């Protein structure tokens, strides 16, 4: 809605002003932050600062545009509800965090979309778009001092406001499932709690890369290549300010679900016992190459710098991040798996979920006595 007009720009003018500079203007929302951004030529960076400041501070939320956007979001909510993997992730978040805000879908419940009015959006912006919550990041061929001065001019009058004070969620775990008509596969999300971004330790990212990054990883080499249980599978360490999740996702034929879960738990237990030196070297190099590659991409550099500022209050130098990767030992990676298994699994099943599948899954992911 912020792109639907400001006090000084109507909706078409926002698009025209950006496109006249050859720039992209957009936004995205994650569980713990919203980002408004522009991408274009470095010589126009100051223009981008002032345009984003206008959008963030002076959006008018026209009633007619709100009605149209509401219909778009309601349609999107239907599509999310009909998608088995999206459904599995929503169930997984609820299994992890219960009713905490961290467990809620970014799009929100349908009732909120139908209920929210212009006054609600105005109050939300006044509460959240304040100096204590905003970071401004620029990357690329720019003059940092000049951009810093422009940021002060454009955003300097923002009231400081109140910082966010959200209690971290308490991990629960357990099994959630939902049968979706018309699905031929079972979509699963299996995971465990890990530390959030404020714990500046890459051991959990290394653990995820050891377990499931690349075709030579245990997840893919064993479940896909050797046993043929899955076509698609992946593993990530998703870290937010307040919490984190070690996440394994896969799509499997319903009659292979039990075997898939059994083998997954065996692989996790094996990693908890020991991490092979070659697997650690592979994971370390994969993360280092990703870090170096992202450093050559201004958009990724901006996003990572903003997340660093929110979680740590500083931007981590590249050499420091590489040194931290090198400092994690094989025992340190195995310790991540040990802590996760001790916490207990959270599992979500969606799509083709047969009779008794959730009960069998609950027994299969239960830690061994």
Q: Model-found features: residue ranges?
A:
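Active/ligand-binding-proximal structured segments within catalytic/core domains
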Residues: 1-18, 199-211, 219-225
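Charge-rich, well-structured scaffold segments of protease-associated domains
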Residues: 10-169, 179-181, 194-195, 212-215, ...
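Catalytic and ligand-binding motifs that coordinate phosphates/metal ions
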Residues: 172
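Active-site glycine/GP-rich loop and adjacent strand/helix microenvironment
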Residues: 175
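A domain-level signal for the structural core that forms small-molecule/cofactor-binding pockets
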Residues: 190
């Amino acid at each position: 809605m912020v792109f639907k007009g400001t006090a000084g720009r109507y909706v078409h003018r926002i698009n025209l002003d950006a496109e006249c500079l050859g720039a992209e203007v957009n936004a995205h929302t994650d569980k713990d932050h919203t980002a408004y951004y522009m991408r274009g030529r470095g010589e126009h960076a100051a223009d981008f600062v002032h345009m984003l400041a206008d959008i963030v501070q002076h959006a008018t939320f026209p009633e007619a545009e709100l009605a149209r956007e509401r219909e778009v979001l309601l349609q999107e909510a239907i599509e999310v509800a009909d998608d088995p993997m999206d459904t599995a992730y929503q169930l997984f978040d609820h299994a992890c965090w219960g009713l905490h805000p961290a467990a809620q879908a970014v799009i929100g419940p349908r009732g909120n979309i139908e209920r929210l009015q212009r006054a609600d959006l105005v109050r939300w912006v006044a509460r959240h778009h304040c100096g204590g919550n905003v970071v401004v990041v620029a990357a690329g061929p720019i003059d940092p001092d000049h951009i810093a001065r422009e940021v002060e001019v454009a955003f300097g009058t923002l009231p400081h406001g109140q910082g966010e004070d959200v209690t971290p969620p308490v991990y629960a775990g357990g099994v959630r499932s939902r049968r979706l008509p018309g699905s031929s596969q079972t979509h699963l999300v299996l995971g465990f709690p890990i530390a959030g971004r404020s714990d500046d330790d890459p051991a959990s990212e290394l653990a995820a890369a050891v377990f499931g990054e690349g075709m030579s990883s245990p997840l893919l080499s064993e479940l896909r290549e050797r046993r043929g249980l899955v076509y698609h599978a992946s593993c990530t360490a998703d870290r937010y300010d307040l919490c984190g999740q070690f996440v394994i996702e896969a799509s499997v034929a319903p009659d292979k679900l039990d075997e898939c879960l059994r083998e997954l738990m065996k692989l996790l237990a094996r990693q908890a016992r020991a991490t092979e030196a070659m697997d650690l070297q592979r994971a370390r190099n994969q993360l280092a190459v990703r870090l170096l590659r992202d450093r050559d991409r201004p958009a990724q550099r901006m996003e990572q710098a903003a997340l660093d500022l929110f979680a740590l209050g500083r931007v981590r130098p590249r050499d420091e991040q590489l040194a931290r990767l090198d400092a994690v030992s094989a025992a340190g990676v195995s310790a991540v798996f040990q802590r996760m298994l001790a916490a207990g699994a959270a599992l979500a099943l969606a799509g083709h979920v047969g009779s008794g599948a959730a009960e069998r899954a609950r027994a299969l992911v239960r830690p061994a006595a």
